[in-house]
Amino acid sequence: MTVSSLVALPSHVSGPRLAGMTGQSDEVQVHRRFRGPPTSGNGGYVAGLAAEWIEGPAQVSLLAPIPLEVPLHRRRDDAEVMLFDAQANYARAAPLDDPLNFEVPGPPTEDELEAAAMSFPGPSGHPIPGCFVCGTERGPGDGLCIFAGESPHRDVAVAEWIPEAELAGEDGHVEERYLWAALDCPSYFGLCEPRPLALLAQIAARIERPVTPGERLRITGWERSREGRKHHAATVIHDEAGEIVALSKALWVEIKELPA
């Protein structure tokens, strides 16, 4: 059965969440607002678009830079969701077998957050200053403004995030694609120095509960291991009570320069 077959949706509007069904398809676009590098979508945001049709924890592989402002097909066949067009397959999402049961650092303290904010690179030192999630050229109401700086006490990057009301869907909760986006960049800034230029190749996430706009969240990113050009990292989001809201693991791959 085909649901919403080739219906054009604005990038900020969710397609139908029918995770138990198969054979569904629609059309989405990644608006320029949701870019990572200058000419392609933010990896976490795009992963969230694909994962919306997966019930429960999901893993998303990013197969090619995701173009901006062009129609993309989103299709689910059995357990797999693909984002693609006539030129390429861009993302593949599937249910996650790994429960992500690894040890996570505790939430950052107020002092830690304050010190980390001071260490975050400014526009001249930022590798992708226009990024929707972490770009220093983006302001409130435009980007997520998650500036995960280095902790002075631990080998992690930490930041505070208070989601804005416009990130909410019809149910009043922050749309999960934005939680996926928030899980993206902090894991990069958690990579150990010297931190290479790298792009997200794969991300797996588990969302523990819905998030309400205005909640005060604390985000921690860290490197778990590295092998050659591959860096395995993770991100955890805690609420004010210290409970885990979302958790992810990510694969970053070093590159020499950003794609044109």
Segment roles from a protein language model:
Residues 205-260:
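Accessory, usually C-terminal, subdomains that scaffold auxiliary metal cofactors
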Residues 23-27, 57, 154-158, 202, ...:
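Intrinsic-disorder/low-complexity, polar/charged segments enriched in Ser/Thr/Lys/Arg/Asp/Glu/Gln
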Residues 32-36, 167-169:
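Short hinge/gating elements
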Residues 1-27, 78-171:
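Non-catalytic linker/capping segments at the edges of enzyme domains
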Residues 34-38, 46-79, 180, 184-219, ...:
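Hydrophobic beta-strand-centered segment that forms part of the acyl-chain substrate-binding groove
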Residues 142-208:
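A mid-sequence, solvent-exposed acidic-amphipathic segment
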Residues 59, 80-84, 232-236:
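Residue-level detector of beta-strand face positions
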